Amino acid sequence: MQPIWTMRPAETGLAGAARRVLRTKLPPAALLAAAAVTVAAVVAATGWRAAGPAPSAAQLDEWQAMVAQAVEPHALAQLRTLARRGSGDAQAALGIALVDAREPGLRDEGRGWLETAAQADGRTDTPAARRAQLALGKALLLGSGDMPKDYARARTLLGEAAAQGDPAAAYYLGLIYRSGYGVAADPVRAAHWFEIASRADIPAADFMLANAYREGSGVPRDEARALALYRRAAEHELPEAVQTLAMAYRNGELGLRPDADEFHAQWIETAHALKHPVVAP
């Protein structure tokens, strides 16, 4: 037993093994061999820890938000490491976080990761690929930083995502065909894609589909259906829908009777909705 003044906690694990090897009185050759085995074990264990279990979707979302809001160094490093190892989810998260960054270099990096994730080695039906296609398609449709608009490429990317069931991509396809961005305007196709997005409870799609039914654009004119869709979008505090209802009550539109009280109530709600706008899909 060691004297009390020299006693130390028991050394365990690879670090303890390394120290014990160095304290052992062995011939030089044997000592070198033992040290080499120990170092190899340490390297192997370290590599295993670095790979580790894949982070959860919630963790990736948290890192994405941290990078998007403040380019937080630790979150950025984590996503870059995973993206370089081939994680499609990390590539999509990093691309989405950086595509609207202030620094041009970071924006370029973001677009690069979105391009990589959107391809997904040909497996474009993966969730990561759909997220990347949606984000890149939106950026090319609406414009992002110094990225030039490319309506044709946007339509292709959004079409691929929508074909795999992404309702937000369907909404943006509706906008493309409604306004004729890079293609002839097609009210029927626009209404079709708005209908798909509306089924997923996207308020902006409800509003655009309501407009189509109100105007008879691409679908039969149906004010009752339009009113129901406006009301559903207004329940989500979409400012445009609330304002439309207010004007309908004021002017007696959409089959409603003029109602000053409802008009004022909806007008107040419009002001509230403008302060807390619905996040775009």
Task: Place the predicted regions along the sequence by residue.
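Hydrophobic face of amphipathic alpha-helices that form TPR/SEL1-like repeat modules
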Residues: A93-D100, Q133-L142, Y172-S179, D206-E215, ...
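Structural signature of tandem alpha-helical TPR/SEL1-like repeats
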Residues: A70-H74, P104-W113, M147-L157, A184-W193, ...
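N-terminal leader/linker segments that initiate helical-solenoid repeat arrays
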Residues: V39-I96
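Terminal, low-structured helical/coil segments at or just beyond the last alpha-helical repeat
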Residues: T244, R250-P281
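N-terminal intrinsically disordered, acidic low-complexity segments at the extreme N-terminus
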Residues: M1-A15
